[in-house]
Amino acid sequence: MHEIITLQLGQRANYLATHFWNLQESYFTYNEEEESPVDHDVHFRPGVGADGSETYTPRTVIYDLKGGFGTLRKYNALYELTEDATPGQGLWDGREVLQQQAPIPQSDYQKSLDAGLPAPTLSAETVRYWSDYNRLFYHPRSIVQLNDYELNSKIMPFEDWTIGEELFNELDKEHDLLDRDVRPFAEECDQLRALQVFTGSDDAWGGFAAKYIDRIRDEYGKKSVWVWAIENGKKVDRQTQFKRDLNKARSVHAISTQASLYAPIIDPPSRIPQSIYLDARSEWYTSALVSAAMESVSLPTRLRPYHDFEASLAGDDGTHKIFELQSTMVQDGEDAANSPIKTEFDLDFTYDGLACKNSHHVFNQLQVSRGLADGGGESGGEDQGILRRKRHFNSEPMFQRFHTTLPFPILDSFPQNMFPELKSKEKINILAALTVSSRTAERLKVYETLAGRVAGVDERETLVNGLGEIRETYETGWMSDSDFDDD
């Protein structure tokens, strides 16, 4: 087995990850059904419930602030034994005054799941928390509430990157988070393959993630670390945007050099095709759109047979870690793969349609097509080492395509009206990609300039120089007149 442990850091990360886990649960097959092409052991762990029954729960650790879990409890029906509702007073003989916060009422969707009834159609109005559309049970160890900060607090907002750093340091000093939260899951693995991290990157969760991943690298140095770094795409005032951009710059600087994959994700992107309906005010909607691309492009990591996803990410030189996430929804019968390297997609989650001042160069592209006719990939007839040297000599990009006939399922936990023009309402075909290109250098240059103007004196030089060093790897090693641009 090649297991993956997931970390979910913060509210936006949990909105996206909940869609991800609902999709994984939908791939299970039962009884006489044909075996699923998805290997569930990659992301799920066997266990035993409170009543002795066998369980199968996600191998994940979910962090959120106080009030962020909604109706999700640490102990659910799988792990909860009936407790005495009127416990004794113990040694205290005085009068007790018990103060409890009013419980959040369960959503109709969750009530229907518990009762085994058909689920009602969800809407932006009925989804209040990410737990409102969650379809899975989690192990109690997976639920970690951080009580130091409260969700959406105006008094102590969890927004500044350094606050996240400080919170991690305090908690890690007191509890050793890696030992308490990650190690129990890691020790259950036969062959731990990677750690997958969903995190916000333009708020305090970026600082929290940076410190966490630094610890992960110390402990699991040879394992892959895949980071889905979520940025708030909603319009805000100029001052707030400066703060967010500085947080992004800090996250790229601190995390991308430690990660095997660092994919900045704008949630939501501003450029939405007319064929897609999106309620940009709803995180349930926007994270659903992201999940269609993110879950599709990472699908090879859990398909049978084993795919060497890491080698495809590494490219020819292993120096590029910042990837662009892109996708296109494809109608039945469409040929989505006329040419191997694609530079234009319907949805660009990383640079939101940013065009370089000059034509941009693609260093590496990994495509995943699902539900489509297999257009084939790079020829396997020639030795891969020779192909790699040829590409390097000719400044050509590395290209890899994975294909599966498994379409993207439209679950009842997913917005039902997001793809109104597609023929099928139950499944869609998707072409998704992770791309390394010189557009990253353009964005890093913007961050360098911002850091030079806005960052504090104590971090300015380190941040500007560090971003400059990363930027150079996306500018060198290719010829500007390469054929692989967006002509």
Swiss-Prot record:
Keywords of the record: Mitochondrion
GO cellular component: mitochondrion
Source organism, top-level taxon: Eukaryota
Pfam families cross-referenced by the UniProt entry: Misat_Tub_SegII, Tubulin_3
UniProt cross-references to InterPro entries, sorted A to Z: DML1/Misato, DML1/Misato_tubulin, Misato_II_tubulin-like, Tubulin/FtsZ_GTPase_sf
Chief localisation class: mitochondrion
Cellular location(s): Mitochondrion
BP-aspect Gene Ontology terms: mitochondrion organization
Family: Belongs to the misato family.
PANTHER family assigned: MITOCHONDRIAL DISTRIBUTION REGULATOR MISATO, PROTEIN MISATO HOMOLOG 1
Function of the molecule: Involved in the partitioning of the mitochondrial organelle and mitochondrial DNA (mtDNA) inheritance.
Name of protein: Protein dml1
Source organism: Aspergillus niger (strain ATCC MYA-4892 / CBS 513.88 / FGSC A1513)
